[in-house]
Amino acid sequence: MSYTMGIDIGTYETKGVLVDIKGIVVSEAKRKHKMLVPRPGWAEHRPEEDWWNDFCFISKTILKESGINPEDVKAVASSAIGPCMLPVNSSGNPLMNGVLYGVDNRAEKEVRELTAAIGEDLILKKCGNALTSQSVGPKILWFKRNCPKLYEKTDKILTSTSFIVHRLTDQYV
């Protein structure tokens, strides 16, 4: 029989499910993690501990509890909180904690500056949304300005989902 595994990494927990070809839940698991708040207005996750280790723990737990042969899992779907910002080096290793979506507002100054420089109308026309604490672009600008040594070591900036996909496939998406 064929199975599909789905794992979702959320703000406060990771949950996963294994379903058969008919969509019947065979096994499920969840694991809590913390949102770090190193300063007021900041929100972070530890990518290794909170994203990757949770993903592996949930996968192993679901497979063990289901008793199925892992080779019968034909697809793995992953979703994760976003949009997040995670700088990685050329080996794909995180250079800092992942900066979370709209709950992290460290780049408020950059949001204001970019909106003033580009214009709200043009941003809306090109992006379909205003720049907010949800936007990754201003967070990247904040990172460049405030962490120049880490920025120089950055090979790519990933989302939480692209970090998981890279760990699974050694590919960047």
Please identify what each model-predicted range represents.
Residues 57-173:
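Glycine-rich phosphate-binding/catalytic subdomain of phosphoryl-transfer
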Residues 1-97, 125, 153:
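N-terminal glycine/serine-rich phosphate-binding loop of ATP-dependent small-molecule kinases
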